[in-house]
From Swiss-Prot:
HAMAP family: UPF0145 (MF_00338). Belongs to the UPF0145 family. SUPFAM superfamilies: YbjQ-like (SSF117782). It comes from the Bacteria. This is UPF0145 protein LCA_1282. Pfam families: YbjQ_1 (PF01906). InterPro entries: UPF0145_dom_sf, UPF0145_YbjQ-like.
Amino acid sequence: MTNQILITTTESIPGKHYEVLGEVFGLTTQSKNVFKNIGASLKNVVGGEIRAYTEMMTESRDVAIDRLRQNAIEMGADAVVMMRFDSGSIGTDMQSVAAYGTAVKYID
């Protein structure tokens, strides 16, 4: 079985017939180290993008997608449709990201 499956935000995959296997999720909670948090606090005073947190969000998103993909593979899926993200803060320096969608298996 391949590690590469299609993950799409669309409702359907044009030209493919499939059965729904169920929901799949990928979850992660990330935080930056204390030094990056101090730098972010200083940046908060003067304004502008806080790159350490942007990087953390990008990393969190990638981890969540990888975990969603693994969850789908374990279910025997060929693809994930309707993939979405949700995120939220925990305290002042942690971020949770959930990637979720519907695992499907192609019908020949």
